[in-house]
Regions:
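Amphipathic alpha-helical interaction segments
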Residues: 1-5, 28, 32, 84, ...
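Short, Lys/Arg-enriched, Trp-marked, Pro/Gly-tolerant hinge/linker segments that flank
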Residues: 8-35, 39-50, 68-79
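Short, amphipathic alpha-helix enriched in basic
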Residues: 34-45, 87-94, 123
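Short alpha-helical "recognition helix" segments of helix-turn-helix
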Residues: 47-55, 102-103
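Short coil turns linking two alpha-helices in DNA-binding domains
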Residues: 54, 58, 109-110
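Residues in the helix-turn-helix
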Residues: 61, 72, 112-113
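Alpha-helical DNA-contacting segments of helix-turn-helix folds
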Residues: 66-84, 88-89, 117-136
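Sequence-specific DNA-binding recognition helix
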Residues: 92-132
């Protein structure tokens, strides 16, 4: 992306400038969308349609931006929510919260869906992660 923007700044040929401007704008827009998603992870109404509306683009355009990084909006959202939940489960400051409260705060509305996705991604259940905290801190 830096090379694309540099080509524009240095006055590349017309085709190079058009491609670079387009690529740079797409990268900047994807970055802005990802930042927005990260700030709204706990929002249970966070959808590709809602994000697209906030950025004044179509849902399909948002999906295409994520496809350029070999992922999807839904996958990005899921992985970010799982990461937040795992950090909270491992953090002693959240020891008083239940697994379901942490899942809800991370943006999951369905506990069984959360448990299934968490286990699939991390290879252990949220409860297993929570139970291992004292051992991890003692090591």
């Amino acid at each position: 992306h830096v090379y694309d923007l540099a080509a524009v700044a240095l006055g590349g040929s017309g085709d190079v400038v058009r491609v670079a401007e387009s690529h740079g704008v797409r990268a900047a827009r994807l970055h802005a969308i990802k930042t927005d998603v990260l700030q709204a992870l706990g929002d249970h109404g966070l959808t590709v349609t809602a994000i697209a509306a906030r950025h004044h683009v179509s849902p399909r355009y948002v999906q295409m931006l994520f496809e350029s990084e070999d992922t999807t909006f839904s996958r990005f959202l899921l992985l970010q929510r799982l990461a937040v939940a795992r950090r909270m489960l491992c953090d002693p400051r959240f020891a008083d919260r239940t697994v379901s409260a942490i899942a809800f705060e991370a943006g999951f509305g369905d506990l069984s869906h959360f448990n299934r996705d968490f286990r699939r991604h991390y290879g252990e259940s949220p409860s297993d992660v929570r139970a291992a905290i004292p051992r991890r801190n003692a090591s």
